[in-house]
């Protein structure tokens, strides 16, 4: 899970929490020790959004790139970089975004 805290925000969080505890593997990517992170088997620190690459669709057909505005504060990896690593990709998330934008948006 990344960028969410369902153990806090869900109205029936007790049901979610019991299900989360029953999983063999649960990973929380978080900047803080949230309620969900505390119940997860693994917690991975994530960088602040000001340290991160990204993109978004502001409204239908209007796209924007997100560029880091500060140097990394700690030795953390962006969630998307971790996912790319897990699928044995040699690309960084920056490279992935660049390729995606060149092939599909620009």
PLM regions and their residue ranges:
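Non-catalytic alpha/beta scaffold blocks inside enzyme catalytic domains
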Residues: 1-106
């Amino acid at each position: 899970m990344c960028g969410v805290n369902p153990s806090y925000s869900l109205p029936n969080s007790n049901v979610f929490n019991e299900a989360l505890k029953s999983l063999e593997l649960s990973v929380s990517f978080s900047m803080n020790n949230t309620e969900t992170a505390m119940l997860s088997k693994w917690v991975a620190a994530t960088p602040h959004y000001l340290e991160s690459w990204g993109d978004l669709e502001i409204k239908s057909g209007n796209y924007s790139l997100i560029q880091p505005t500060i140097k990394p504060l700690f030795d953390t990896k962006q969630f998307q970089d971790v996912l790319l690593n897990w699928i044995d990709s040699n690309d960084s998330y920056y490279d992935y975004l660049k390729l995606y934008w060149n092939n599909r948006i620009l």
